[in-house]
A protein has these predicted regions:
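N-terminal amphipathic/basic-hydrophobic helices that include classical n-h-c signal peptides
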Residues: 1-6
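Amphipathic alpha-helical segments
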Residues: 9-14
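Catalytic cores of enzyme domains
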Residues: 15-191
Length: 191
């Protein structure tokens, strides 16, 4: 199920908010391959350096199996002005940070509204400036720590293309993509 996107424009950037839902059985069958996608995580410099990134002391597949349904929440970010494109090209993570924080806030609200649910954020944990895992220390805020779809083995590229109609795009060294997609989810016990 996919809802019609809501669009906004501000400071040379257009955003579209997307939502979709699917049963966990479909998610597991079509979009989760823990071994494959955690293998990609192993190539990332953040792997083993953040508590929101693998390797974990739990089986990610077990997380999925505790829930019955997945609701996706995403924001497409279109840098349209010259200044927005330059900012997106210079430092994509910083350019996207306010959109990421807004999406994480929405996910937090949805999780709070739905007892027994679990939110998956749009990427790595942003709670601490420097993750305690880098210093071989336990997470300082375990109640705030959330994982991402991809860190638990989800194929985010296929998921957003199929369920939200927003295939991932890649920029070049000279130009950002037409749009970025930030996607998170809320896993729920009931269909």
């Amino acid at each position: 199920m996919r809802e019609k996107p809501m669009e906004e424009r501000e400071n040379g950037v257009r955003t579209a908010h997307l939502t979709g839902a699917l049963p966990m059985s479909e998610m597991l069958e079509m979009y989760v391959d823990v071994e494959k996608f955690l293998g990609y995580c192993a190539a990332c410099p953040r792997c083993g350096r953040m508590w929101s990134c693998p390797p974990y002391d739990f089986d990610p597949e077990e997380v999925w199996l505790r829930y019955a349904a997945v609701t996706l929440y995403a924001v497409q970010v279109f840098p349209e002005s010259g200044a927005a494109k330059a900012a997106a090209l210079a430092d994509p993570e910083m350019f996207l940070r306010p959109y990421r924080r807004a999406l994480d806030t929405l996910l937090e609200e949805r999780e709070r509204e739905t007892p027994g649910s679990l939110r998956l954020d749009a990427g790595r944990c942003l709670v601490c400036e420097r993750c305690a895992r880098r210093d071989a220390q336990p997470c300082r805020f375990p109640e705030k720590l959330r994982y991402s779809l991809e860190s638990l083995g989800a194929n985010v590229g296929a998921l957003v293309a199929d369920k939200l109609g927003a295939p991932l795009q890649w920029g070049t060294k000279d130009a950002p993509p037409e749009y970025f997609v930030l996607v998170g989810a809320v896993l729920t016990k009931g269909e």
